[in-house]
């Protein structure tokens, strides 16, 4: 009887450990996807593919307003010269992430470089249609 109890206990412990490892691996994968998404989005903004950034990463409900802002930014001649990711926080268990980015930019006809801080809120979708990170905040005002 004692022997059976030990085997059952060992089985339960091993099962719990394997579940914990599987969850940790899933969270690691979600973190890697977050890193890729937030870097990809900001890189597209940097290289003036604002519409592509919005269509790829933005929540569909926010796209119309985003595209209007993108059009306004292009009309005003705003050019992003550099960006720095100041902080990024990914919370896989809550399926949320937050990024603080600093952009250096100028708006024609001025050649003066300005700096803007942009706080981005992200959420992770895990549905049959789509898995991945979506941006929940629109473009900042490039004054």
Feature names for model-found ranges:
Residues 1-8:
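Bacterial N-terminal signal peptides that target proteins for export
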Residues 19-47:
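Short, low-complexity N-terminal intrinsically disordered segments enriched in polar/charged residues
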Residues 35-36, 50-97, 111:
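Short solvent-exposed beta->alpha transition segments
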């Amino acid at each position: 009887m004692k022997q059976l109890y030990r085997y059952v206990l060992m089985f339960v412990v091993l099962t719990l450990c394997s579940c914990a490892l599987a969850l940790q691996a899933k969270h690691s994968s979600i973190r890697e996807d977050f890193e890729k998404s937030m870097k990809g989005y900001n890189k597209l903004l940097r290289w003036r593919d604002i519409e592509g950034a919005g269509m790829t990463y933005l929540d569909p409900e926010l796209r119309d307003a985003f595209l209007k802002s993108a059009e306004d930014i292009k009309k005003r001649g705003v050019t992003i010269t550099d960006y720095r990711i100041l902080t990024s926080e990914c919370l896989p268990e809550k399926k949320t992430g937050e990024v603080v980015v600093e952009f250096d930019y100028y708006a024609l006809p001025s050649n003066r470089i300005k700096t803007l801080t942009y706080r981005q809120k992200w959420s992770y979708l895990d549905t049959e249609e789509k898995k991945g990170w979506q941006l929940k905040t629109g473009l900042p005002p490039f004054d």
